[in-house]
Amino acid sequence: MKWVTFVSLLFLFSSAYSRGVLRRDTHKSEIAHRFNDLGEKHFKGLVLVAFSQYLQQCPFEDHVKLVNEVTEFAKKCAADESAENCDKSLHTLFGDKLCTVATLRATYGELADCCEKQEPERNECFLTHKDDHPNLPKLKPEPDAQCAAFQEDPDKFLGKYLYEVARRHPYFYGPELLFHAEEYKADFTECCPADDKLACLIPKLDALKERILLSSAKERLKCSSFQNFGERAVKAWSVARLSQKFPKADFAEVSKIVTDLTKVHKECCHGDLLECADDRADLAKYICEHQDSISGKLKACCDKPLLQKSHCIAEVKEDDLPSDLPALAADFAEDKEICKHYKDAKDVFLGTFLYEYSRRHPDYSVSLLLRIAKTYEATLEKCCAEADPPACYRTVFDQFTPLVEEPKSLVKKNCDLFEEVGEYDFQNALIVRYTKKAPQVSTPTLVEIGRTLGKVGSRCCKLPESERLPCSENHLALALNRLCVLHEKTPVSEKITKCCTDSLAERRPCFSALELDEGYVPKEFKAETFTFHADICTLPEDEKQIKKQSALAELVKHKPKATKEQLKTVLGNFSAFVAKCCGREDKEACFAEEGPKLVASSQLALA
């Protein structure tokens, strides 16, 4: 890289990082500004989502009352920005409103103490009380009742959907949830007039639920990354991903987008959903205005209405690689001035390396690209302190080979197993694997993580070879983050804490390297843990699987060194036992009679 080019790049990069592309005008009334920008419909939806994410146990009607009061106040401020209290910050206005809830102390306990604090400490306090695993009932589709409610009052029906999703996912990306609510509305608009509402709705709602869970997991990873690793780590993640998506965009352009995308997500993670949605709309506008220099895949997105446009941009496929990309070694391994460039502007130089490497490798996962950049940085730190730096860093690219081979080998091994046994048994293998790594973790969490990891096989193993690695490791990052988030609330394993907090890039290899926990004292065998009743026969298939998989995790906790064959025998016996008794006329009598025999034979098989 010629030095004059690097200087101009440094100027562009620094300018982009300090300014970004979003407007940052000051307004007399923040709430009036956001109300005018977003419009009443989106304003109300986002305030409802924000309040539901903070107070997850409050009834829907209570939240609607708060939202209506805030909306009326916003209208007053929009009409006269100098009206009383209109100059207060959104955190102050929303926090004051939340603190008026009469049942705050009784329902939320310590959260009520937040109301004694001043901003910004009060909002930070509210954030720490968000519950990633709230004790809320499972939502089940009831097509007839739901269609009646939808036709009677569509706005209330969609508001209830926003509320139910938001309180179960307290870090859900606010503006994206508005998009999913439109999908939800479209599903009911299509299916409610159908003769068989159930047959029409169920597949659509199941598919929407999967998209919701994925979207929630993606945003939770961003919010956790801000909290545990800081803004620099989030920006590095985004540089790698956007460089893969937009390989034709230059580094300064990618940097600008990363800066503002980071701002958008930081706002949403901090509960600032109105600013987040407003800034996201501005960023989508900027990207579409500059699409010619960013990506050839954006045109279809940019023709859509706002919510669909932003969603489409976020999900857009990687653009085609430019055909004239030069080899990287010349600039990053052979140039004699590398140490000078690195010392003069470390973040810019490393950012440039990450951008250049990532745009050439859509076949790598983001965390692999970050591990490569981390290795490159460590090599420069070492070599630039030596007598002959160029001789030292000349072979740096050779160090990347084992970093690439490790996840490729892991993906092949896991996909081979998935293709051999199918999703359910693949999940079982992962539940066993992770229970052995961290037997102290609660059984419901281990089963949830094992099932999620198992679904990665279905999602990724059928893809072409070039897409398997990024698909697998990017989705593994989401599942492992869920484990880390749940473990952070109730930490039980120092090894898990270390993997979760040491390094975002190294998190997956850290978990992969965990072995059987030799210091774990096995759980005592309790017959009631493996006692089942006739109600299992009428459960939906996924709930039946969870019951069996919970028993499997408990078996491993009882016998961590049980062999694969032993566990397979016991699980096979258990499945046969359930099938046998569910086929009997007097199911409960069968469970009562055969259950103790199963427990005894299981103990014997594991002895």
UniProtKB/Swiss-Prot annotation:
The residues that hold Zn(2+) are H91, H270, D272
Superkingdom of the organism of origin: Eukaryota
A Gene Ontology MF term for this entry?
metal ion binding
Which residues does this entry mark as bearing Phosphothreonine? Answer: T107, T443, T445, T569
Q: Which residues carry this modification: N6-methyllysine?
A: K557
Which parts of the sequence carry N6-succinyllysine?
K587
Q: PROSITE patterns annotated for this entry?
A: ALBUMIN_1 (PS00212), ALBUMIN_2 (PS51438)
Record: residues binding Cu cation: H27
- Location within or outside the cell: Secreted
Q: Found in which tissues?
A: Plasma.
| Record PTM text | Phosphorylated by FAM20C in the extracellular medium.
Matching entries from InterPro entries are given as: ALB/AFP/VDB, Serum_albumin-like, Serum_albumin/AFP/Afamin, Serum_albumin_CS, Serum_albumin_N
- Disulfide linkages recorded for this protein, renumbered to the chain, are C77-C86, C99-C115, C114-C125, C147-C192, C191-C200, C223-C269, C268-C276, C288-C302, C301-C312, C339-C384, C383-C392, C415-C461, C460-C471, C484-C500, C499-C510, C537-C582, C581-C590
Q: Which residues carry this modification: Phosphoserine?
A: S29, S82, S89, S442, S512
Which of UniProt's keywords are assigned here? Answer: Allergen, Calcium, Cleavage on pair of basic residues, Copper, Disulfide bond, Lipid-binding, Metal-binding, Methylation, Phosphoprotein, Repeat, Secreted, Signal, Zinc
Domain Albumin, which positions? 19-209, 210-402, 403-600
- Main location per the UniProt record: secreted
- What residue range is the signal peptide? 1-18
GO CC annotation: what is one?
Answer: protein-containing complex
One GO BP on record is:
negative regulation of mitochondrial depolarization
Binding of Ca(2+) 1 occurs at E30, E267, D272, E275
* UniProt propeptide residues: 19-24
Q: What's the stated role of this polypeptide?
A: Binds water, Ca(2+), Na(+), K(+), fatty acids, hormones, bilirubin and drugs. Its main function is the regulation of the colloidal osmotic pressure of blood. Major zinc transporter in plasma, typically binds about 80% of all plasma zinc. Major calcium and magnesium transporter in plasma, binds approximately 45% of circulating calcium and magnesium in plasma. Potentially has more than two calcium-binding sites and might additionally bind calcium in a non-specific manner.
What family does the database annotate? Belongs to the ALB/AFP/VDB family.
Q: What is said about its interaction partners and assembly? A: Interacts with FCGRT; this interaction regulates ALB homeostasis. Interacts with TASOR. In plasma, occurs in a covalently-linked complex with chromophore-bound alpha-1-microglobulin; this interaction does not prevent fatty acid binding to ALB.
Record-given protein name: Albumin
Its lineage opens with: Eukaryota, Metazoa, Chordata, Craniata, Vertebrata
The gene coding this protein: ALB
